[in-house]
Regions:
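Catalytic cores of the polymerase beta-like nucleotidyltransferase superfamily
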Residues: 1-391
């Protein structure tokens, strides 16, 4: 590559942060100081950014021209971007959200595949390394208050690393909530940050508590505020077992009725698997708490409601959710799991030759169900001799 000598390349953000924490990091975000879009293209970079110039090199890494931002309207889209060649590295880092994300290392060279060789020197104009060592989340500048997404990001990083949040950053986030900045967040963006938190974090409940403390939960997810204390312990248990995002979501809304749960997650633009598991978990919890008799007929009816014969994974996840919520449900969950296992292979071929020849339509389903009920009844009579399944 042939760039003028004043053009400099730096890796920034997550890579520098996570290397200092001795964590694996797949983020390779680069900043280019002093270059123009034309220079980048002439040197084989492919432009991909629409709002501001971002380029890919042969290794697939992103290189963005150094830029400054100026707030011109409400919300996280309301920024005007300046990527003039005079923008310095420090000016680019100054626009970033947190001090721990505002560090850089210079690129010294590249190998034949486009992978960068880096300087060992940490460029750290805002003391992010000290905040990492102290376990503290701190904003770089008051420009933090111009982007409501940064509230969610700050809390996400705090939950991810178990860090404290600097008092001045807490105060700024509370001001942003009072000023209505979070009202401009779209459901899609809230879900994206929420999903990242539950994927990365070992303390989802702490994230929700911090949202509540600053008043953001009342704006973003008011329906779950009342039930939050009851799900703190189940969430901690689920986090400890590295449960999926869908399981954690189902726990969060398990106190709500089925209709409300489905509406809640659909409004938050959650994927279908999250909505489905949350709905079935709320249904099963209500059944266990208010109307469980444990008859063979009810067990079969519940298995069918869980689509257990078509989606055994969904059933297992639902049983995990309700046992996270209440350990007392473990025995009943085991009964359901075993009943599904011993009846899953009962099908049309299990009927007598006469039944196969004469039954039609729903009569076939009724006959199959009768066989399943018979099998479950036999199991219930002898289940004290059977093993159990752990969820």
């Amino acid at each position: 590559m042939t760039f003028p000598s004043h053009v400099k390349f730096f890796i920034v953000g997550g890579y520098v942060r996570d290397r200092l924490l001795n964590c694996e990091c797949n983020d390779h975000d680069f900043v280019v100081v002093g270059a123009t879009p034309e220079m980048m293209i002439e040197n084989g970079f492919q432009q991909v950014g629409a709002d501001f110039p971002v380029f890919l090199n042969k290794a697939g890494d992103e290189y963005a021209l150094a830029r400054k931002e100026r707030k011109v309207a409400a919300g996280y889209h309301g920024f005007e971007t300046d990527f003039d060649t005079s923008v310095t590295l420090e000016e680019d880092l100054f626009r970033r959200d947190l001090t721990i994300n505002a560090m850089a290392r210079e690129v010294l060279s590249w190998d034949d595949n486009g992978h960068a060789h880096l300087s060992d020197e940490i460029i750290d104009p805002f003391n992010g390394r000290r905040d990492l060592e102290d376990g503290r989340i701190r904003h770089v500048s008051d420009a933090f208050g111009e982007d409501p997404v940064r509230v969610l990001r700050a809390l996400r990083f705090a939950a991810r690393y178990g860090f404290d949040i600097a008092l001045e950053t807490y105060d700024l986030m509370k001001w942003m909530v009072r000023d209505g900045e979070l009202n401009h967040l779209t459901a899609e963006r809230v879900w994206l940050e929420f999903e990242k938190t539950m994927t990365e974090s070992v303390d989802t409940s702490d994230f929700l508590q911090m949202l509540e403390i600053i008043g953001a939960l009342d704006i973003l997810m008011p329906e779950i505020v009342k039930g939050l204390p009851a799900v703190q312990s189940p969430l901690e248990d689920a986090d400890g077992h590295f449960a999926s995002v869908a399981i954690k979501c189902a726990i969060i809304t398990s106190h709500m009725n089925q209709q409300a749960v489905g509406d809640f997650w659909r409004r938050r633009k959650a994927p279908n698997e999250v909505v489905s598991l949350a709905v079935t978990s709320a249904m099963l919890r209500f059944t266990f708490e208010h109307c469980w008799e444990g008859t063979a007929e009810q067990i079969l009816s519940t298995l069918k409601a869980l689509a257990a014969f078509n989606n055994v994974g969904g059933m297992v996840d639902t049983l995990r959710v309700v046992t996270y919520i209440n350990e007392a449900f473990t025995e009943t969950a085991t009964v359901l799991s075993t009943a599904q296992h011993i009846t899953k292979d009962i099908s049309f071929g299990s009927l007598t030759e006469d039944q196969q020849a004469t039954l039609k339509g729903k009569e076939i389903g009724e006959a199959i169900d009768a066989l399943r009920v018979k099998e479950i009844k036999q199991y219930l009579e002898t289940r004290s001799f059977l093993g159990t399944t752990t969820f």
